[in-house]
Amino acid sequence: SSWGAFNIMSSALNNQNINLEIVKIAEGISIGFEITPLGAIFGLVASFLWIFAAIYSVGYMRGNNEKNQTRFYAFYAIAVHAALCIAYAGDLLTLFIFYEVLTFSTYPLVTHKQNEMAQKAGRLYMSILVGSSVILLLPAIIWVWVATGSLEMSQNGVLDGKIDVAYAPLLLAMFVFGIGKAALMPIHKWLPAAMVAPTPVSALLHAVAVVKAGVFTMLIVLTNVFGIDFLAKTGASEWLIWLASFTLLATSIIAIYKDDLKARLAYSTISQLSYITLGGALATSMATQGAALHIITHAAGKITLFFVAGALYVGAKITKISDLNGHGKSASLIFLAFFIGSLSIIGVPPMAGSWSKFFLMLGAADSGYEVVIGVFCISTILNAFYLMEIPARAFFFKKEREVSVKIPKLILIPTLITSFLT
């Protein structure tokens, strides 16, 4: 699938028009696929990182002696392929169908441990993601069909001249809060709750498929349904700029106070997703490019950080940041990978994450929202504070207890490779 995604990306870069209609239900309503530049980017990221996630998951599941591994791998594969179908969806109906397939296929992964905490997390996961999509996203899609007579999308948007400008912010709100996978406040609580799942699932949720499908869908709606020119002209996304900015900063502050490593990374993810939503809401070409690039850079960086969290659990049964003191020498390569991945998430030049943040800042300046540049800068400081604490504790704090750290090679190798992709 990675080679196919690479060929699709090449076709998109060469402006080749590739589309496939599977079923035509009615005029303007069909199930089919079409290659867009943004979809090609998401498809390539998901399929490429899945290789390392799959290898890592074998090492993790075996190293941790997890039960029901066959079921786990089956749903893991279904989830990734659902994400690819979202990436290449040619219309809103196809997008919605595979958006739901992704939700239902990841539920068994979230509840894999089958204990009370996993079941509770699974109920919250399904209630928020399915509830938001059925109550808000589906009606929003129907509204677009009523307004335009079609569920097809366009690179310039489809709503200009088709909808009363006064109703545009309301329709956008239905889409934004209907796309629960983008994890904007206040519909973000499913993501930290889902951290009870095995670490390969966390990597799938945060880097490869689920949340990336959410922000990809958000960008598609902002650019290919509304259109950045329509948003800039009407100001329909102004409220979203402030909501995304608030989410970005608030979750960064919350992350600082989380001692559980996966919980801290979960709130970090919510913050980083808001960068992408904010880039789309700014409604400039530069900001949109920055948002698309941030999908790539955050995916590589965050999958590395979660790989490290899983490695520490399998190798030393460490889950708390406060328990990392002095263990840097016994797991130096793992903490080096975390350090490199963190530099990219923070946005330290010349790491990949610095380029996406640079384009986002340029986009903020182009849009006239200079205050957003300040939001990005404050967030970067907060990122450094809550991420650099981990390697700092490992290498510079005094060891409080002796722990034997043994990292399986199937965990170590993918972690090191993804760290160098950042």
Question: Locations of the language-model features?
Answer:
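Hydrophobic H-region at the start of alpha-helical membrane spans
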Residues: S1, L44, L129-S133, W242, ...
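Transmembrane helix-loop-helix hairpins at membrane boundaries of multipass inner-membrane proteins
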Residues: S1-A74, G149-V158, I220
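C-terminal TM-helix exit segments that contain a strictly Trp-centered aromatic cap at the helix terminus
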Residues: W3-N14, L138-W145, I345-V348, T422
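Membrane-interface helix-loop-helix modules in multi-pass inner-membrane proteins
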Residues: L13-F42, L92-L95, Y99-V110, G178, ...
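Short, membrane-exposed interhelical loops at transmembrane-helix boundaries
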Residues: V23, F358-G363, E400-I407
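Core segments of transmembrane alpha-helices
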Residues: S47, V210, G353-S356, P414-T418
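Hydrophobic transmembrane alpha-helices and their helix-loop junctions in integral membrane proteins
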Residues: F52-R62, K67-T70, Y76-L95, S105-F358, ...
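Cytoplasmic/organellar membrane-interface segments at the starts of transmembrane helices
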Residues: K329-I334, A384, M388-T422
